[in-house]
Amino acid sequence: LEILPVIGRLIKEKNGKARAIVSGNQILELKEQDDRPVLMAAFDIGTTTVAGYLLDGKTGEQLATASALNTQTEYGADVIMRANYSLKYGAEELSTCIRKLLRKLIGTLCEAAKKSPEDIYQVSVVGNTCMHHLFLGIVPDSLVHAPYNPAISQGLMFPAEKFHLGIHPGGQLVALPVIAGFVGADTVAC
């Protein structure tokens, strides 16, 4: 809504030449036209490894890739151990841990491509259902007890600033949908 009052003025001042970055039905940015890139990042949060990709948001071209050991391994080597840890202590530590890793990987991706994290307008994340839930800060108790259903299965979109990823302040985070208790968004992405 904060963009709406300036739309008319900006278009008039720039002789109709303005740049709007739109995600779904939301205007993420409106400013005078420039040559700055519109970037996206995608992450596959695996139990062991997190893989990241930096993409040109206009062409879809892959600009850089990076990967790292999932830092949640310090809380348990596998999904069951991490789920049990979160049942006992909550999901906040595990969630913060993986979010910090994504922020670090965003820096690595941008450095490799000689781009700025401020030019990333969307981050998409996938993972098995437990990794999905822990990233979002959801204790996966519904996954460790019958009938082993996810707490949330639909795709979600959030303001990325809530996840402290260090991208454009108006950027979005998209968590792809999961299918079932142990069929996650990583399968949806295939």
What are the functions of these language-model segments?
Residues 29-72:
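Gly/Thr-rich phosphate-binding beta-strand-loop-beta motif of the actin/hexokinase/Hsp70
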Residues 30-31, 44, 70, 74, ...:
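Alpha-helical context
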Residues 60, 66, 85, 170-177:
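A near-ubiquitous, low-amplitude feature marking generic local secondary-structure context
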Residues 71-111:
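N-terminal phosphate-binding loop and adjacent alpha-helix
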